[in-house]
From Swiss-Prot:
One of its GO terms (biological process) is translation. One of its GO terms (molecular function) is structural constituent of ribosome. The gene is rps14. Belongs to the universal ribosomal protein uS14 family. Coiled coil: none annotated. This is Small ribosomal subunit protein uS14c. Keywords: Chloroplast, Plastid, Ribonucleoprotein, Ribosomal protein, RNA-binding, rRNA-binding. Gene3D superfamilies: 1.10.287.1480. Binds 16S rRNA, required for the assembly of 30S particles. HAMAP family: Ribosomal_uS14_1 (MF_00537). Its main location: plastid. InterPro entries: Ribosomal_uS14, Ribosomal_uS14_bac/plastid, Ribosomal_uS14_CS. It comes from the Eukaryota.
Length: 100
């Protein structure tokens, strides 16, 4: 189980990313449209003004049961060991255990 402070920090990052998403997107579009280097530099400086934690690259996918940041399966939103336990308990419809 992840510490609650880490989960709250991740939620805060998600809110910041949603807040500054449009600013980042518009700045990146402006950079591609402008041809002069000086104007690109000004837009680049403007792009650096939002907080660091508002960048989408700083977000992690977390298991929604345990909060674990690693070994997540996108289809289920679960970490690997929780997914395995749920499949063994037949709690995930359509998921089968492999055997050979």
């Amino acid at each position: 189980m992840a510490r609650k402070s880490l989960i709250q920090r991740e939620k805060k990052r998600q809110k910041l990313e949603e807040k500054y998403h449009l600013i980042r997107r518009s700045s990146k579009k402006e950079i591609s449209k402008v041809s002069s280097l000086d104007e690109k530099w000004e837009i680049h400086v403007k792009l650096q003004s939002p907080p660091r934690n508002s960048a989408p690259i700083r977000l992690h996918r977390r298991c929604f049961l345990t909060g674990r940041p690693r070994a997540n399966y996108r289809d289920f939103g679960l970490s690997g060991h929780v997914l395995r336990e749920m499949v063994h308990a037949c709690l995930l419809p359509g998921a089968t255990r492999s055997s050979w």
